[in-house]
Amino acid sequence: AEEIWEYASRTLTQSAASVAATVAGSTITAIRGDTLSAALENIGALTNYSKLWFTVKADEADTDATAQVQIELAGGLLYINGAAATTAANGSITINDESTGDVTILLKAPETAKLSPGSYYYDIQIQSSTGILVSTLTSGMFVVAADVTRATS
């Protein structure tokens, strides 16, 4: 069997847009109108929790109901661009490793298309299974880059 690097040709199996929607340090960058799939690793153990949220806001003092994005582990996409989401399945949080706290945030293209280019704040919070303790596991900047092509059909 040949080693992969010995093949006559190789095919990129991930789009450049998927690669661009990345996490660098504590900054998540998404391209407006593209599906965001961002892997965050080692954010802290995800055990004994009842809720987990990923929230993006223009100002940290904004209410959750006016968030640019809010996704809840069990509930999916709750808010988009300051309004209640109409399709909860367009956003999700997947726990990849509970012990280290590896998660993947997914926000589908129809939802990122609703976001204005700019810099925002994000965090991931967890509520303990007792319902009392809420902790911020990680936070940083969420950048929405403008898309060049706006055609959808």
Report each predicted region and the residues it spans:
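Fibrous stalk/shaft segments of extracellular and virion attachment machinery
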Residues: 1-20
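Contiguous segments within soluble domain cores/interaction surfaces
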Residues: 15-153
